[in-house]
Amino acid sequence: MKVFLDTNVWLSATIFSGLCEELVLQCAQQECLFSSDLVRTEAHEVLLRKFPQVPNACDLFDAAWQAAQGIPDMAEPGGDNDRRLVKAAAAMDIDLFVTGDKRMLGWGSAKRVTGVMQIVSPREAWGILFGGVVEP
C-alpha cells in the first residue's frame, strides 16, 4: 500500500511524539511512504515560523523525510497547495492520503490512475494499515 502524508502530519511527527510519529516510523520501515518537495517546502516554512524555539526542527524533519520516496509536484491548481498535493498523490496511484486538515478530509477520496485514493485522518490510516486501535 502506498501512503502519502500531508504536511501537517509530517509537522506533528517532527515536533510531537505520538500517533503521527509512529505512522512515519512504521510506514518508513515498511517502505510504503511517499512525499513531495512541496511538503518539504511547506514544512520548513512552518517550522521556522511557528517553532523557532526548536532550532534543529528542519534537520529533524529532513532526517525523517529522507525515508519517503519522492513523487513529482503538480503546478496546478495554482494558489491551492492542498489540491496540488492531492492531485500529485493521485497521479502516482497512492492508496492513502493522510491528513489532519478538515477541509481535505471532507473530500473523502480522489480519483487516481486505478480506482480511488482514500483521504483519511492519521487515526483512520493507522487502523487501515496496522489494524490496531491506537491509544488517544
Show the residue positions of the predicted features:
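Short, well-structured N-terminal submotif of metal-dependent ribonuclease cores
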Residues: 1-35
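Alpha-helix capping/helix-boundary segments
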Residues: 9-10, 39, 84-85, 103-104, ...
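Residues that scaffold the ATP/ADP-binding catalytic core of kinase and kinase-like folds
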Residues: 12-14, 46, 107, 128-129
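Glycine-rich, phosphate-binding/catalytic loops in enzymes
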Residues: 20-23, 52, 113-116
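PIN-domain endoribonuclease scaffold, especially VapC-family toxins
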Residues: 24-76
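Short active-site oxyanion
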Residues: 30-33, 93-96, 116
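Acidic, PIN/NYN-like endoribonuclease modules and their adjacent C-terminal/linker elements
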Residues: 36, 79, 102-136
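Active-site neighborhoods of divalent-metal-dependent phosphate/nucleic-acid chemistry enzymes
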Residues: 64-110
